[in-house]
């Protein structure tokens, strides 16, 4: 039986890097747990106030992605890159 990553068609990389959810001149810290070509899995302290579309900044600005929320669960957010 194929694994979940095989079914998804894209390898997800466990990266555990600090990130910032940036929107409307504000920023919320997050942990980027997994990332792949089309999206990422984020962990946050609280989802309160996080909009459905935002910019994700990783590694102090070395990586930047416009993204939108695909799913939310407790402290985790799944996003797709635009």
Which ranges hold each PLM region?
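Structured alpha-helical
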Residues: 1-82
């Amino acid at each position: 039986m194929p694994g979940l990553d095989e079914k998804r068609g894209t390898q997800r990389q466990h990266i555990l890097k600090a990130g910032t959810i940036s929107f409307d001149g504000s920023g919320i810290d997050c942990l980027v747990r997994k990332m792949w070509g089309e999206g990422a899995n984020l962990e946050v302290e609280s989802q309160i106030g996080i909009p459905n579309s935002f910019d994700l900044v990783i590694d102090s600005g070395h990586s930047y992605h416009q993204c939108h929320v695909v799913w939310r669960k407790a402290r985790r957010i799944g996003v797709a890159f635009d």
